[in-house]
């Protein structure tokens, strides 16, 4: 930048800070979806782990099921118009997976997208960078994440394999975004302890299923030997 060649140390530090912003150099390790069930309860589904492809496949199942029940449903995210939606779509392509219909904008004109972004809504038709999720939570009186983790610390948490912690961090952000959207519509918001958290995918679940299946397989094997 400005004709100055960065040192190896500076490049290393910038890589740690900026690589996660690019779908080409990073991966998804956690996703959360917050939604109201038919009884009006707030449910938050968490998908987390090291296997990105499995996370995206599980996410597709949920998104496609939601669309099957309501073809007009929309996704809502914060600063998602220029990051979360395109980033997630790119990771689907990189993993050679079909993009869920609700994220696929390939056949849409720029003004035809149905998904919403609270950052764009907060601009109220104006221009500018908008506001951070935390700033909006503060000014609107919305509960802020209770996980002692911020965005630029997720990478370190990933390498420590703290996937459940990252998943809950994402869930609290999803709930906060949900509450902000309800504030825009003058509706009541939810406290974090009023939310039903569901682990929709984690590698611990897969490992548990394998462990639980082993005794049954052993019994079948032994029974076969006896006969």
Placement of each model-derived feature along the sequence:
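Metal-dependent phosphoesterase core characteristic of DEDDh/y 3'-5' exonuclease domains
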Residues: 26-41, 67-168, 172-194, 201-211
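Acidic catalytic cores of enzymes that act on phosphate-bearing nucleotides/polynucleotides
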Residues: 197-198, 203-227
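Conserved RNase H-like, two-metal-ion catalytic cores of nucleic-acid enzymes
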Residues: 1-65
């Amino acid at each position: 930048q400005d004709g100055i060649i960065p040192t190896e140390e500076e490049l290393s530090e910038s890589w740690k800070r900026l690589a996660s912003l690019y779908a080409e150099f990073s991966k998804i390790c956690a996703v959360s979806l917050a939604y109201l069930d038919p009884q009006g309860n707030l449910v938050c589904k968490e998908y987390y782990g090291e296997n990105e492809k499995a996370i995206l496949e599980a996410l597709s199942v949920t998104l496609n099921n939601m669309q099957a029940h309501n073809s007009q449903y929309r996704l809502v995210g914060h600063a998602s118009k220029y990051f979360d939606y395109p980033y997630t779509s790119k990771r689907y392509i990189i993993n050679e997976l079909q993009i869920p219909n609700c994220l696929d904008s390939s056949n849409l004109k720029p003004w035809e997208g149905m998904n919403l972004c609270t950052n764009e809504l907060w601009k109220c038709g104006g221009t500018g960078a908008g506001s951070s999720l935390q700033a909006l939570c503060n000014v609107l009186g919305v509960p802020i994440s209770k996980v002692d983790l911020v965005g630029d610390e997720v990478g370190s948490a990933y390498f420590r394999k703290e996937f459940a912690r990252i998943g809950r961090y994402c869930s609290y952000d999803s709930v906060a975004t949900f509450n902000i959207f309800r504030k825009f519509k003058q509706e009541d918001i939810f406290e974090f302890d009023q939310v039903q958290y569901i682990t929709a995918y984690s590698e611990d679940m897969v490992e548990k299923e394998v462990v639980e299946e082993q005794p049954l397989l052993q019994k079948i094997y032994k029974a076969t030997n006896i006969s």
